[in-house]
Amino acid sequence: MQDLFKGDLSFDLEYLLALRLIFDNKGLLKLINSNLNKEEILNLKELDLKNLNFKSIERYEEDLKNIKKYLTLSKGVLEKLNKEGIKIISIFDKGYPERLKIIEIPPVFIFCKGNFSLLENKKNIAFVGTRKCSELGSTIAFKTSAFFAQNKFNIISGLAKGIDESAHKGALSVDGLTTAVLVDMKSISPNSNKNLAEEILKKNGLLLSENIP
């Protein structure tokens, strides 16, 4: 699958992001895997889009004609990300995690802030669980996370209430590494965990999302 992610689109981040503003992630992957070049994509007609199994064909065709508008929006997004210290990594970049490329629908972009080296960390463990956990469940998540963090594992969770929150806190309690996967870099939910997100960054952790902020 990695061999598919080569070609014309790999050389222009601004252009690739503009296409992501038009298409969803799955749609953009279709274009990447079609091996079309920039000019061919901009000139896609109704029949071409149908052949690529796209829906909402009329909208896509119109948006591609107005690519300059999306390039302007893309440039604005990139400038804003730079100001806010958020790194954008495309599936074409060397820093993109190899293991992420091999999933069925990999994100074309990942957005991150903090310790970028965690993207290549070899020892990772994810914690997933209910937001409405019992006190016992919270304690187990905290202690288990702390144990693995002490053994150099990067603790990955979603910064939500409950198990996620306990897992992050367990890692931080032993000055371990932890990564929070967010809806987007602006959407820290619940608001009460904004301080936890800041602590993750202060302690060499990482905030990560696949969606444009």
PLM feature spans:
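Short, small/acidic-rich helices and loops at N termini and domain boundaries
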Residues: 1-94
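Glycine-biased, small-residue-rich flexible motifs in mid-sequence functional cores and linkers
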Residues: 2-9, 88-213
